[in-house]
Amino acid sequence: AAMMRTKGEAGTGNVVSAIQHARLVAGEIEWLQQASDLEFEGAVEDVTDGFMRLESMSPLIDYELISTPFGDLNTLSDGVRDVLEEVRKMGRLPVVTFSAGGIATPADAALMMQTGMDGIFVGSGIFKSEDPTTTAEAIVMATAHFEDPSKITEASAMMATPMPGLEIDTLEVRMDQRGN
């Protein structure tokens, strides 16, 4: 992989799920760093087993797993172990990590950067703001200066009305409830 994307609730203007997902990733990295050798090998096995389950995911197709991003099936465990060792050593994912979903204001963008993201994606929800162009410029400014409260304040002041936020509890289907 060249990058990783964490995901909040797209189209909501509500950054809560994005923050929760970023914290989950950070927590799992921290767990990996503190894991005993036995726990670490258990994590390698869990990831490896996830790939092996792919063959049985759909009864509609005859799918044979030949290779994975970590190599062929014979070297799968070694590849997973190598990547998890790298994560353990670096204390972060070995690829850039972007966040998406619910990021609608400069403050949201800065907050995601402060949680350790390398960047953010802003979706079509930006067009629900009063002035999408200025909103985009303000979010870019806050992202670039996420450690400078005065710049974040300045970026926030640039904006007109952002997209209206939706409460996640009111959604019929949530991102975290989709798929397997």
Report each predicted region and the residues it spans.
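Active-site beta-loop-alpha junctions enriched in small/polar residues
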Residues: 7-11, 37, 66, 96, ...
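Conserved, mostly hydrophobic/aromatic
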Residues: 18, 97, 112, 123, ...
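C-terminal helical cap(s) of enzyme catalytic domains, especially alpha/beta-barrels
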Residues: 13-29, 128-151, 163-167
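Conserved anion-binding
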Residues: 1-94
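A short, acidic, amphipathic alpha-helical segment used as a generic capping/interface helix at domain edges
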Residues: 82-86, 104-113
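A short, charged, Gly/Pro-tolerant segment at domain boundaries
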Residues: 37-41, 152-180
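Glycine-rich phosphate-binding active-site loops on the catalytic face of alpha/beta enzymes
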Residues: 2-16, 102, 115-135, 179
